[in-house]
């Protein structure tokens, strides 16, 4: 038999939960302590370095862990943004006055687990203190550009809300260091600004990519008539659309890059019916389609980074599913071999030290990696505990254990206390994929782990063997529809009962061996 999900009751539960209010007094004298884990880290959205100190000072923006700073080239990090919104979309360092930093909140890698932001912040003391300086309603910020000649002029690319129309989208400009803002380019309420480039030799020349998108509960539409590539030659007063050589509309997201050493050389990855790589040799006036691998053109809505070497227009890097590079200005790309060891897939940020361009830092769904040989080998930067937990549970042992699933980093468990404190070595992996629900069984020897699409396993903690236990449809049943984040829980009154939900609610009383 099936226990059908009661939609009305589920909706009532959501409404009840929405009315709960939390305040600091509910925690009394309890203080939070950091348990980690830092062994796998989490999604990195932005990396910026300070040019003046040989790249020793780094700022790392994360999808759900705020901003972190290193003053020793990534050997260690400290959190500098705990009091504010933890979803970071963009960072910018004023290289003329490197104590001035801008942080745009609201990640712009528009997947189904993205969090919105609350505006843009400014620090004038290298991240010790921050002040919100506006753009409260844009929700997501994808790029911040500081004018290379007049650092009071700042441009902000705002894709805008993920789930709804909004007039607070587009390209914003400040001429007074962020004290006030003007929306200088706007298409419509469904289209925002995804990327912006200032010509370093003539910063009145601006290239922007506009992006129409909308996420729904069960789908994501990346693209529409509002998307396109535009150019301004007067500092953002007027814009004209660039079309020559680009594919037929509609477009989705467009990633753009300009060579700092030769601003005539540009590359763009254009999401369309036939997503492709395009090259320009005249500053973006005309474009030519280039053959490129699936990895180079993969998922532009999620992989939107394309970077030229600061000093060499022939060297280009494309972080995506994997890391790719070009030695001929983007005419061809090669996939990195990772001779130095594994690097986490799903890559979103890359900062290259302009004084030593062999040194670079790569931001992935699994943290930050450093290379000193142009991306041939990589070293993982430990000590960034910014993993994104979807769900957390615990058992009743002494000390009790903590269980949880992390975005793109599997499912893990660790004791709540250990001699000398909890370290990375105390965390043990019990599942793969995008870890979601991770639930201990009442027998104390078993844990249930689940990853995307309702794929669930029973794990024996004594020998770490796992067995697939997802309920399967019979010939008389409808095709089962599993959520990306599928709930799996044990019974409150009878912990021997295990419940999972597709469009039906299933129960098992034998650890998932059979279901009804």
Protein language model regions, located:
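Bacterial Sec-dependent N-terminal signal peptides
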Residues: 1-20
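Beta-propeller blade termini and top-face loops
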Residues: 19-516
């Amino acid at each position: 038999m099936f226990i059908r999900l009661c939609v009305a009751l589920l909706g009532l539960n959501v409404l009840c939960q929405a009315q709960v209010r939390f305040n600091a007094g509910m925690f009394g004298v309890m203080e939070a302590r950091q348990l980690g884990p830092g062994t796998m880290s989490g999604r990195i959205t932005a990396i910026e370095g300070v040019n003046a100190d040989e790249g020793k000072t780094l700022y790392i923006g994360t999808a759900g862990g705020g901003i972190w700073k290193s003053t020793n080239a990534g050997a260690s990090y400290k959190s500098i943004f705990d009091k504010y919104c933890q979803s970071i979309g963009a960072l910018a360092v004023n290289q003329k006055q490197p104590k001035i930093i801008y942080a745009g909140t609201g990640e712009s890698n528009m997947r189904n687990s993205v969090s919105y932001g609350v505006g843009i912040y400014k620090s004038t003391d290298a991240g010790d203190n921050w002040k919100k300086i506006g753009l409260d309603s844009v929700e997501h910020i994808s790029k911040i550009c500081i004018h290379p000649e007049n650092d009071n002029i700042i441009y902000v690319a705002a894709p805008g809300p993920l789930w709804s129309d909004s007039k607070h989208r587009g390209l914003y400009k400040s001429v007074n260091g962020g004290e006030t803002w003007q929306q200088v380019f706007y298409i419509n309420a469904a289209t925002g600004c995804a990327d912006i480039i200032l010509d370093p030799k003539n910063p009145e020349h601006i290239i922007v990519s506009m992006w129409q998108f909308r996420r729904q509960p069960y789908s994501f539409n990346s693209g529409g008539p509002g998307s396109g590539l535009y150019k301004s030659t007067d500092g953002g007063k007027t814009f004209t659309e660039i079309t020559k050589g680009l594919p037929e509309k509609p477009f989705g997201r467009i990633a753009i890059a300009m060579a700092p050493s030769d601003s005539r050389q540009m590359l763009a990855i254009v999401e369309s019916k036939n997503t492709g790589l395009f090259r320009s040799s005249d500053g973006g006036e005309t474009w030519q389609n280039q053959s490129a691998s699936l990895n180079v053109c993969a998922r532009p809505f999620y992989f939107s980074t394309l970077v030229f070497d600061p000093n060499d227009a022939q060297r280009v890097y494309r972080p995506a599913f994997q890391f790719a590079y070009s030695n001929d200005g983007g005419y061809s790309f090669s996939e990195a071999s990772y001779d130095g060891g594994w690097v986490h897939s799903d890559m979103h940020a890359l900062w290259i030290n302009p004084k030593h361009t062999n040194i670079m830092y790569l931001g992935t769904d699994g943290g930050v990696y450093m290379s000193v040989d142009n991306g041939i080998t990589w070293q993982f930067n430990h000590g960034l505990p910014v993993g994104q937990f979807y769900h957390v549970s615990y058992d009743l042992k002494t000390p009790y254990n903590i269980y949880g699933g992390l975005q793109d980093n599997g499912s893990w468990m660790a004791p709540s206390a250990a001699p000398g404190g909890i370290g990375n070595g105390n965390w043990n992996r019990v599942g793969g994929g995008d870890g979601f629900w991770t639930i201990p069984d009442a027998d104390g020897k078993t844990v249930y782990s689940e990853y995307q699409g309702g794929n669930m396993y029973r794990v024996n903690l004594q020998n770490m063997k796992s067995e697939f236990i997802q309920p399967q449809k019979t010939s008389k049943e409808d095709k089962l529809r599993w959520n990306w984040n599928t709930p799996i829980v044990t019974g409150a009154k009878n912990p021997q009962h295990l419940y999972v939900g597709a469009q039906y609610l299933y129960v098992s009383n034998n650890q998932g061996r059979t279901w009804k």
